[in-house]
Amino acid sequence: FKEAKASYTTALQISPDFDEAKHILAALSGETTDSPPRVYVENLFDNYAPVFDRSLVDNLEYAIPKLITEMIVKQNPISSLGSILDLGCGTGLTGVEIRNFCAKLEGVDLSNLMLEQAGHKNVYDKLTHRDLVDYLLTEDLDFDFFIATDVFIYVGDLSEVFRLIKSRNRSGGKLVFSTEHTDKDGFFLEKSGRYTHSK
């Protein structure tokens, strides 16, 4: 990691406003920030979008969308789950799994190219290109479920997300999400550039 830290330090000396380098350098230095720069997340997934599904599903046998869907359906044995907002919906892998169990499905994501892939799956009633917190601040949050599948590892401090959903959703909607675990208190920025969270 020493060579990488040196490279990003040099990059910041040349371009002090290089936010992506700041984030990676913080991760490599063991410094935990509240959230990554939006441009870092957007560029990361814009670049990943064309091969995202093949990389996760085919190569890594990614199963979290299916597991989350099965858990929700099992704990809510009703004919329809009602309306669902897929936070950080990406290419729509969770949407594919849960579409048949809900009456309305909407998705929001920071990466426009990921949303293009999600649109090709034809499972969402509406897709919105927006930062997650901005969306929660401004849009109607009248949903029965909020799902965030491997999204919060790119958020960090979740307090604002939790607060907005609780205060702006008046229909008692439930939030279901996955995280990567840490034994440290609160949340921690790993060297991978992703965040881990404690209970």
Residue map of PLM features:
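Conserved alpha-helix/loop element of class I SAM-dependent methyltransferases that forms part
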Residues: 61-80
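Class I SAM-dependent methyltransferase SAM/SAH-binding core
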Residues: 85, 91-135
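A conserved beta-strand element that flanks and buttresses the S-adenosyl-L-methionine
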Residues: 147
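A short glycine-rich, Lys/Arg-flanked "PGG" loop and its adjoining helix->strand segment in the class I
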Residues: 159-171
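Conserved beta-strand signature within the Rossmann-like core of class I S-adenosyl-L-methionine
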Residues: 172-179
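Acceptor-substrate binding/catalytic loop of class I
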Residues: 186-199
